[in-house]
Each structure stands twice: as C-alpha cells, then as structure tokens.
Amino acid sequence: MSEYSMPSYFQTMPVIGKELVSFNEDNAAEIQQVEQEIHEIREAALEAGRSTESLNESGQWTAMQRITELVDEGTWCPLNSLYNPEDNKNGSVGIVKGLGRIDGKWAVIIASDNKKLAGAWVPGQADSLLRGSDTAKRLRIPLVYVLNCSGVKLDEQEKVYPNRRGGGTPFYRNSELNQMGVPVIVGIYGTNPAGGGYHSISPTILIAHEDANMAVGGAGIVGGMSPKGHVDKEAAEALIQAQKNLKSDIPGTVAIHYGETGFFREVYADEEGVLAGIRKYIDMLPAYDPEFFRVDDPKEPLFDANDLYSIVPFNQKRSYDMVEVMARLFDGSEFMEYKHGYGPEMITGLAKIDGLLVGVVANYQGMLMNYPEYKMATYGQAMGVGGKLYRQGLIKMNEFVTLCARDRIPMLWIQDTTGIDVGNDAERAELLGLGQSLIYSIQSSKLPMMEITLRKGTAAAHYVLGGPQGNDNNAFSIGTATTEIYVMHGETAAAAMYARRLVKEEKAGEDLQPTIDKMNALIQDYAKKSSPKFCAKAGLTDEIVDMNDMRPYIQAFVNACYQNPESICPFHQMLLPRVIRDYDNLNQH
C-alpha cells in the first residue's frame, strides 16, 4: 500500500547519514567482548536449576520452550533477563519475560521458570512482575502469563511476601489492567498454591493443563496447620500422615476448578494445547491494522546496523556523530528535525519505524562553538559540550514533548548525557526550573515512551530525558555494552566527598595517602556499579541489548504503541510536522 495521508510531509523526510569510510575493528572487538559476557551470564541464568532433559522427561516443557512455541518467530525481545537485585543463587528472579507477537498481536509475556524451585516466588520477582505489568499498561497491550508457580520460597518469605511492591501487588495490578480494558490471559501448568493460586486466579481468562491445580493453600500448608507454635515428634508424625492423605486429594485440581467452580475457561491435555488456547483468546482481542496509522511504506535503514560497532566509541571520552547512529535505526534513514540550530545540544524530530511515526530526542555529541547563549552574553565567548543540557535545549525538548503529546505520537529517547549545566550562570539561566518543567511536560503528556541509554546516563539529565523514573510514561528502557549509569563520574564523586577532608588534613600536616586510597576505592566502586552488567542486574535498565539489536526493540515498542492506542490525532490535524516545516522555511530566509 502506498496511499497515505499528507505525503508531502511524511514521504519526503530528509535522508540522514553516510556510508562508513572505514570500520574500527578494535572498537567493535571491545564492544563485542562485553556483549559476549552478557550473553554468557544470560544463558547461565536460563540454564540454572533442573536440567531441560529432566523436565522434558517428566512431560514438562521449560519456560523458553513454551515461549518459543507461543511467540511468532523472530519477534521475541527479552526484558530483565539479567535482573537479580537480591543475588539469588540461580542468577535470576525465577521468571522469563519479554515482548513478543502472538499471531500478529504484541503482548507482554511472563513465564514462570520451572527449572528453578518449580517456579517459586523468589526475592526480586514481584518487582519484575510489576515492571512487566507496567509495560502492558503503558502500551495497552495484553499481558500473558505462562504460569507454573509453586508459591513463595518460604525460607525467604520476608523478601517476597509483604511490602508495598511485594507478592500481592501484582494481583492488584492485574485488577487495574482489567479495569483499563487491558486483558490478562494465563496458561496454567503444574501446582500453583497460595501465591501461585492468586497468581492463577487474578487474570481475565484462565486456561489450564489437565494436570494443573490452583489453590489458596497447597497440600503442605493444609497438612501443616498446627496451633502448638513448634514441631514435636507427634506433630511430625501427624504431618506425615496428612501428606499421605492429601496426595489422593490435592486441593484445586481441574476436577474442582473446571468441573465445579468453572474458573478454568478451558482445559487441555498437552503442553501445546494450553498455548494454542492462549493464542485463541489473543485472536479474539481488538487490534488496529498497522496500515491504519502508517504514513509511509515500511523500509529498512539505508545503512547497516553493524556499523554501530564502529560508530559508537567504547571509550567514553571519545565523541561521535549521533546522527550516524540514528541513520542506522530509522526507516529509510529519514528524519524530520524539529528546530535545527536552536538548542543544538539536543536533536529532536520525527522518524518512522515500519512506516509509523515516532518522536525522537537524542543527545548531540561534540563541541558547540559560541554556545550556550547565556555564557556568550556574559563572557563574550563560550564553548558548549554535547551531552550536556543547556537552556535552549531544555526549552526545545519541553516544546517537542508537548507537541508530540498533542499529536499523540509515541516517543523514543536516546541518551548519552553528562548532565545539566551547573554553576551560577546555569542558575541564572533557570536550568533547575527548566529541568523540572521537562519532567512536568513528560508527566502531563500521557504518552508511551522508550528510552535507550546508549552510553552515559548521568545526574538529573538521566531523569529528564525520558528515563525509567517516569513510571507513568516509560514502557521500558534498554542499554548497550557501552552503557554507564551513575549520579556523577566516580572521580567527581570522590572529589565531592573528600575535597574538604584533604584540605583539613593538608592544613594539619597529616598524611594524605589514606584519604587518597579511599578516593580511588570509591572511583573503582563507581566503575563496577555503573557497568552494563550491574545496570541490568540491579534493574537500572530493563535489558542490555546488542548494538545491532536496538532497532528490533524500537520496532516492538512502536508497533505495540499503535496496536490499541487510547487516543488518536488525525494526521491532517497534527501540528508538529507543520511547525517543523514553517520553522525551516523561516530560517531559510
């Protein structure tokens, strides 16, 4: 199809980028070495626990085998695969999660990892579940559980069961999604007592394997009710007998919840049947044909995504051309820039992903002569630095977010930032207020947003540039092998913490070396805790992806945004493309 609205705006976007003159093999090798380390950690986490062979021999599939059968080939985008904030021994929080298409419709898919403690709730899992439901909420796409959950890991219940974002919170979130009209569909396998039972019952549609069960309490709980407050031999023997009796009367089987309560909508005899049942109900859900929202035919970028291994420097002190990165991400390497030349530290504008509009904000990299204007006015000269935020850039981003919100265009942020400008010049230029203004603009936009921390995410700039802190907007964030996230550079932090002590010790004639050692230890700690591996493990970003895999994640995000949007702006009623054209025309004269 090639008949689209307003072709003079959307099918004549300027082409950006150019072919590489040479490829930096050394830079690529450094990036790929980190990527390989991430791959190995991810694979080890997936394989930890009971062997795949053992599960298959018992008639069960693994979480990944179930996901592979359920999801359309080539569409799986893992999220939080390295997330393990509580250092669980198996390297994960006991679920496998991501975005994927099911019979052409995007969904958030969360599968219990039945290789580990029969899919038990472990520390960190509740927060990861909430991140998944947040993504479904932001994108207004179905949430699909492939459930096989044995309940709370009881010897760590205090880290799993209670708290504001604890074991019960996802059940409230499922109710919230249902009330928003966002369905939650679950395929239930195995034994699901207590926390697993509520996890089973809280979705919209329940589909079960014939051997599945769900219950308020499992056999162990039912048999272990004792008022004594301790266990003696008599109690132990009674527990043994109760367990023997309960094996023939397991709580919450298909006979109860299909045959009597009717909670199970459908029951299947095999693994494939449950997944086919999920697909059946996904097929019933409303979704726009993406052609409805397209402004152009889908195209691949003009340039190879593998070029990114050469373009993006592994050395954080080296600069590069952000436009060349963008040229490897967007359809046809086309980009309609908003207010080129104003606020030059920020690149803002419209791009296309699979023919669908997306608003883009990215940090320019490199030096900026005679900028910012507030320093020029004071000193008669100035040198701005790409990656830092100044007055004009903050104003421009506020305007751009507001126009994207008005035109209902989802947004992509590409961060490589050292923070917002500091000092009294910056204070007089109102940067503190303008940074918070951008947060206000984002919060009021009600837009779904995706954020990529390409290299540095630093200081308050990491918040204001569409970061994951914007919980009502940010659907998910990703990083790369070059990602670093910290409040400030380690050397800066060491100076901030110890400068006064050095002055005091020097004045007193004391040995400075112990303080110097502490400063260097802090610098090393910052380096460790800002690495891609740590960022993923701690959840500072939702996934570390390969350089050449950024576009598939952007495609998943943009297509999901247009699947079932809450509101629409007709193309011929949009303001942003017209503002871009008029600004460009005015500045040509």
Model feature map: region roles:
Residues 2-589:
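Ligand-binding clefts of soluble mixed alpha/beta catalytic domains
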